[in-house]
Structures are given as C-alpha cells and as structure tokens.
Amino acid sequence: MTQTGEPTMYKSIVIAAALFNEGATTRAALTKAQTLLDDGGTITLVHVIDEVPGYVAASIPKEHLSARRREVDDQLAQIAKSAQGMNVKTVIREGQPSASILGAAKEAGADLIMIASHKPGLSDYFIGSTAARIVRHAPVSVLVTR
C-alpha cells in the first residue's frame, strides 16, 4: 500500500510459466496478476525450456525439438488468451531457468516477478530451487505462490 492507503499496482508483471498440470499454477498466477496490474499494464508469461547439451542434442531429431517448442508456444497462447482484455505477452527462452527468467524480467521492465514454488525435494537442498535463486537475485519484488 502507498502512504495514502491506496493499493500498489504494477505496470509490468512477469510470470514464470510452468506448463505441467495443463498450466494450472500459471493460470492461477495470471488470475492473481490481473488484480495487481495497473490499467494499461503488461503481463509477460515466460517459459524456459532447459537447454539440451550439445552431445545429447546431436542424437535428438530437430523435428522433435521444433515440435516441443511449438507445443509450448501453443500452451502459452491458450493461457494468455484466457486473460481477456489484458495485455499479455509470451516469451519462450532456452537455458538456465532462473537466469533466463531474470533476463526476461529485465527486458520487460518488470516491477514484479511471480513464480510458483513447490515443496523442496532433496536436490533443492543441494543446488537450490529456481524460486529461491530468483528471490535472492531479483532487483524487483517477487511474489512466490504455492
């Protein structure tokens, strides 16, 4: 809230888009983002496809990788379409998730990043979760949902 008691609104919100479970967590984040977005603001859905190491990529048909990217693009478009009347953009990146999401947020001029978290597994204790890395390194507010 501002000092006058009015709710703080955001001009540019980046949502880290998870597409498992038909994008249910991303759809929930989009619904929440709509309540936080300033009139005329922009929501950017960012999905990161893990980079396939070169030695593995050589054995995967290019058609398979292209088909996966089209599938992700279609899923993001469907989710974006559900936010009727809102300015929603979609971005697909390849690479390390937290760095890619932070880069997309910088490019979008985001003043809020939204990301879903999960209950930590054993690997999260050793290498850390994407959400934790984003919270530590983001130069803007981060809203973590479960």
Predicted segments, located by residue:
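Small/aliphatic-rich secondary-structure junction motif
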Residues: 3-59
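Glycine-rich, Arg-bearing micro-motifs that act as flexible, cationic patches
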Residues: 115-133
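Structural beta-alpha unit
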Residues: 1-9, 81-113, 120
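General small-molecule cofactor/ligand-binding pocket signal
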Residues: 44-46, 89-93, 143
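Short, flexible loop segments at boundaries between secondary-structure elements
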Residues: 137-146
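Solvent-exposed polar/charged
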Residues: 35, 81, 106, 136-137
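Short conserved AdoMet
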Residues: 37-39, 84, 139
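A short acidic, glycine-rich active-site loop
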Residues: 62-74
